Amino acid sequence: MARMGRRPGPSTTRTLITAAAAQRFTAVGYDATSLRQVAADAGVDPALVRRFFGSKEQLFTAVASALIDPRRALAAIAEGSADEAGERLLRYFLSLLGDVTQPGPLLGLVRSAVTSEHAARVLREFLAGGLLREIAATSVNSERSGLGAALVASQLVGLAVARYAVQLPSLTAADTQELVRTVAPVLQYYLTGNPISVKEKS
């Protein structure tokens, strides 16, 4: 009988489960995903999924947190000139969504939120409780940080839904630079109160 390999540690197991869940949510959506299916995809016992995450909602939140890392989003805002914070944040967000023909890891969460009220609520709570709070805390314009952060989220989520889920022709046809040129000044205004035109980049 072949000798079994060493069992993965808790950190590795959690990562395997999160990755399997992200793929499952992308493939079939939130409502059609079960903890048992995720466990099978990850090659672990369903009890381990419940032990690490408790419920499907908590697992979805963990996937969102792994994909939309607030620290990276904040780094995108904070690193470099304040006049380009909106552009950096948008480029980071678009990199997670990927191209229309080659979806990125975030697209599964967006599609799940469109088709499932449970997923939409979990994503809203994650944005409000994590990402938006951090953006508000580091906003250049502190007087409007709360509203500005919420408007940033509305712009980004709206863009994701319209371009990748609904697939409005004008948005799907636009390339990254065109989106940055058009949308980044809006995000910049939400963040700082000062819209900045985006320069053409080679």
Residue ranges: model-predicted function:
Residues R72-L107:
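Hydrophobic alpha-helical connector segments
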Residues M1-R3, K199-S202:
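Short, intrinsically disordered or compositionally biased N-terminal tails of bacterial proteins
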Residues A47:
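Key DNA-contact positions within bacterial/archaeal DNA-binding proteins
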Residues F93, L106-A113, V152-L156, A160:
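Short alpha-helical scaffolding segments that buttress acidic/His motifs in well-ordered protein cores
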Residues A120-R124, I135-Y190, N194-K199:
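Hydrophobic/aromatic-rich alpha-helical bundle segments in the mid-to-C-terminal region
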